[in-house]
Design a protein with these regions (language model features):
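Intracellular innate-immune signaling modules
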Residues: 1-648
Length: 648
């Protein structure tokens, strides 16, 4: 039980442990419609969730995930819990086990076997039986017989997104005997499907991108951890910070920055913010209080690397060496899509595996080394956002210190090109920061799942003067101010040309990191004065409208097309409708009276509504000739998750 009673915020077996029951803040968990895959960067998903009211969802307590809701009578064997990185999935597992061990909850379960995928990965090449697998992880089970219904057993597989096994649910290999040997992936597949121990309960956690790796027919309930809701955010800071007046100041500061407060849905970000702001505000440190994500993460990095100077390691390793090696690891694994690493990954980046614990000690809260039940080492950064910040810092320092554009190093196809480019990179030709930024913008825009979105925001934010002052120990020279001016202009040009609302929204976040708010402020003036109807907006200005409407202090409630365009100008109304579809799908009331929606426009509208059917409550289509498109609307209304109350 000792393994689960303490919470090491942000770190494993290092730092200051806190009793879980003292700091635990109930997370907002709901039943989700499916385990379908999400191709959005998790930052976008957090922003989307922050805009949606929670009142219509039925919350589920962590300890109740295997209990049917009122009106549900089918037994629940397998639960899939999804949620973005750092949202609290693993802590929920820890709390579930602790409450069970303390005989508070779920006492009908006799045995719980927590099997994190990052530890199971270490045995991916082994052939053994399920009994043998349990004996390896839990030696005390050697005297137990779990092949029958004598025990009610729960298996917890935490971190499906970290799985490096080949889980083939189409395989014909069928195992029904716990003493029969097979590869570990076959064992797990048969256990999840129900061939092995069909009476056992199964709990799988995953980030959204991997949620569909387990077929839906094998899952009886899908839940989603949404992190902290508004009251829970404040509760966390009041528990975490003993000085309540300081806690109030920190909460007020975070609320003043929309981009920071949105991130507070993620418990790990609350911990990062508390670490930084408590130190800066309580110790009267000089310098600007962080208002952007980059500022917050850079301050956090500095606080944690300063631990180094309290230890004896500085004789062997400089800050720059340590940061560059970890940053290189972060960047390479980000490009590959990996969030956990093994010994071979460290070696590729010049990190001596025998010194890994030293790196872990130097960056206590940033990089962690874990020893699982099975003898082996697993490495990861505390949170994906820390991973992305270090990757961005590596790319930035490679350019400013070593005149290298690292994007040129990941696109080489032949040995000849590598050798040729090595000479080019080590020539006197200058690699400008604006060129690096433009390349990074293009790489991020080309990403299908937006996996470089936050990395890009960090990379651009690191070039701001205030950041260069903070990082002066690491930087050989500062960048020129006109580099950022060129980057700002390049981003504004890109906003005019891209069709994806999600990608344009991220570019506005990038402008925010660079300190440029001109487009947004211009649109805010139009909206406040009511002159937006008369204004002839450019495509980039309409993108700014979407950004402003989707990042308000209050959640969206009503969208009326006539607030944005003169009534009876149907051509312009249709044009505006197309541009504001991202806003429409986040609105509870959509008013499209007399706007001449054509079949083409209606097709786009129903597509937007279909992507978020449970949110819309009122739809007004009065005065539009719907025609054949009525079938599209019918499909939306028949969706099981549609909660439309009023249609006109």
């Amino acid at each position: 039980m000792k393994k689960f009673e303490c919470l090491y915020e942000g770190t494993a077996k290092q730092g200051n442990p806190t009793l879980l029951n003292e700091i635990y803040t109930e997370l907002y968990i709901t039943e989700s419609e499916s385990g379908e895959i999400s191709n959005e960067h998790e930052m976008r998903q957090i922003e989307t969730q922050s805009r949606r009211a929670a009142t219509e969802d039925t919350p589920i307590k962590c300890n109740d995930i295997f209990r049917p809701l009122p009106g549900q009578d089918k037994p629940i064997r397998t639960v899939l819990t999804k949620g973005v990185a750092g949202i609290g999935k693993t802590v929920s597992v820890q709390k579930f086990i602790l409450d069970w061990a303390e005989e508070k909850e779920n006492q009908d379960v006799q045995l719980i076997f927590p099997l994190p995928f990052r530890e199971i990965n270490l045995m991916k090449d082994k052939t053994l039986s399920l009994s043998d697998l349990l004996h390896v992880f839990f030696p005390e089970t050697k005297e137990m017989e779990i092949s029958n219904d004598k025990y009610k057993v729960l298996f917890i597989f935490d971190g499906l997104d970290e799985c490096r096994l080949s889980l083939d649910f189409q395989s014909d290999v069928r195992l029904c005997d716990v003493s029969e040997s097979a590869s570990v992936d076959v064992l797990l597949m048969n256990l999840i499907v129900g061939n092995l121990l069909p009476s056992a309960l199964i709990w799988i956690t995953s980030r959204p991108a991997a949620a569909d790796l387990v077929p839906s027919e094998c899952v009886h309930r899908v839940t989603e951890v949404r992190g902290f809701n508004e009251p829970q955010k404040e509760e966390y800071f009041r528990k975490r910070i003993s000085d309540q007046s300081l806690a109030n100041i920190i909460i007020t500061h975070l609320k003043s920055s929309r981009s920071l407060y949105i991130m507070c849905h993620i418990p790990v970000f609350c911990w990062i913010s508390a670490t930084v702001l408590e130190k800066m505000l309580s110790e009267a440190e000089t310098g600007e209080i962080p208002k952007t994500l980059t500022q917050m993460y850079t301050h956090f990095l500095i606080i944690q690397t300063n631990i180094k100077h309290e230890k004896d390691y500085e004789k062997n390793m400089t800050d720059e060496d340590m940061i560059l090696k970890l940053g290189k690891l972060a960047f390479q694994q980000l490009v590959k899509g990996n969030v956990i690493f093994y010994e071979e990954d460290l070696r590729e980046c010049g990190i001596d595996v025998t010194e890994a614990s030293v790196y872990s000690g130097l960056c206590t809260q940033i990089f962690r080394e874990e020893f699982g039940w099975y003898q082996g080492k697993v490495f990861c950064f505390v949170h994906l956002s820390i991973h992305e910040h270090l990757a961005a810092l590596y790319v930035h320092l490679s350019c400013t210190n070593n005149n290298i554009n690292v994007f040129d190093l990941i696109t080489k196809q032949s040995l000849l090109s590598i050798v040729t480019d090595w000479f080019q990179l080590n020539s006197s030709e200058h690699v400008s920061l604006s060129e690096l930024h433009q390349r990074a913008v293009n790489e991020a825009l080309q990403s299908k799942n937006g996996h470089l979105d936050l990395f890009l925001r960090f990379l651009l934010g690191l070039s701001v003067k205030s950041q260069q002052i903070l990082l002066q120990r690491l930087m050989k020279q500062t960048s020129r101010s006109n580099s950022n001016e060129e980057t700002v202009e390049y981003i504004k040009k890109k906003i005019k040309t891209i069709d994806s609302p999600e990608k344009s929204i991220n570019l506005f976040h990038c402008l925010n990191e660079l300190g440029d708010h001109s487009l947004v402020e211009e649109i805010q003036q139009y909206l406040k004065s009511g002159r937006i109807k008369e204004a002839k907006l450019s495509s980039s200005q309409w993108s700014a409208v979407v950004f402003v409407l989707l990042t308000p202090e209050k959640k969206l409630d009503k969208f009326d097309i006539n607030d944005f365009v003169v009534r009876d100008n149907t051509t312009e109304q249709l044009n505006v409708l197309q541009k504001l579809l991202p806003v429409i799908k986040e609105s509870r009331s959509v008013q499209l009276r007399d706007c001449g929606v054509t079949d083409e426009g209606f097709s786009a509208l129903t597509s937007a509504l279909r992507s978020n059917p449970e949110h819309l409550r009122e739809l007004n289509l009065t005065g539009n000739k719907i025609g054949k498109s009525v079938n599209l609307l019918s499909d939306v209304l028949q969706n099981l998750h549609c909660k439309l109350e009023k249609l006109r």
